[in-house]
Swiss-Prot record:
The chain crosses the membrane at residues 3-23, 27-47, 165-185, 197-217. Belongs to the MotA family. InterPro entries: Flag_MotA_CS, Flagellar_motor_stator_MotA, MotA-like, MotA_ExbB_proton_chnl, MotA_N. Each stator complex is composed of 4 MotA and 2 MotB subunits. 2 A subunits and 1 B subunit are thought to form a single ion channel, so that each stator complex contains two channels. It comes from Agrobacterium fabrum (strain C58 / ATCC 33970). Disulfide bonds: none annotated. It holds the Pfam family MotA_ExbB. The keyword Transmembrane helix applies. MotA and MotB comprise the stator element of the flagellar motor complex. Required for rotation of the flagellar motor. Probable transmembrane proton channel. This is Motility protein A. It is a multi-pass membrane protein. It is found in: Cell inner membrane.
Amino acid sequence: MNIVIGLIITFGCIIGGYMAMGGHLNVLVQPFELMIIGGAGLGGFIMANPMKVVKDSGKALGEAFKHSVPKERNYLDVLGVLYSLMRDLRTKSRNEIEAHIDNPEESSIFQSAPSVLKNKELTSFICDYVRLIIIGNARSHEIEALMDEEIETILHDKLKPYHAITTMGDSFPAIGIVAAVLGVIKAMGKINESPEVLGGLIGAALVGTMLGIILSYSICNPLASQVKIVRTKQHRLYIIVKQTLIAYMNGSVPQVALEYGRKTISNYERPSIDAVEQEMMNPGGENKAA
């Protein structure tokens, strides 16, 4: 919603201010200049990035528009799954725990948290490290170092669309100048025309410079910033898993270990301790009620 509101304010102020100065709106309508700038920017974007990053950039923009960040229910689902697994680690046999992590789709623990099960990467992350805990030979600081390395790699991959879109946005002002120069070249071909005709042609050419700047600083870079915000918040789920499991490996009981994970959540989004306790008593309770 913020993106839509921001775009309305941006274009409303630019176009409204221009018309209030007495400008004519039809002069700004230059579809071929937009084609030059947008096409050159998109072509460079495709050349500069692997197809996987190109596709992920489209997905990331969709997430930014929908603001697909974890909500309280998502955090509670993660904490609920971790609590159930840690409880079973203390009370049940290795075979029973392996049944959950080998086939999470069929596990009652993961089925109670559909938002976790839907996130295949996060589910795999949880299962991999619970499996290492079951083995029992690894020390907590070794697991923590391994987790840090994987989490850093995941974040690096998740932010590739941000860097790719930012780079494309930074190129638009220069591409806008290219479009403007091409417009001036066209105008020079009619140098013998009247000043009214030449003025219109040169004005149309200058629209290219304006479009390049607007595409960069008012559209592309703000969208990239929103992509970074969304992807970074999604990444927070991995930090919760890491802090919780490491606390458990260091000797904390499951209830206390959950607090290590809960405290990593931003104050604006952190579920209350009462909500977490309710989740421990009834994992996925809200989902079942729904």
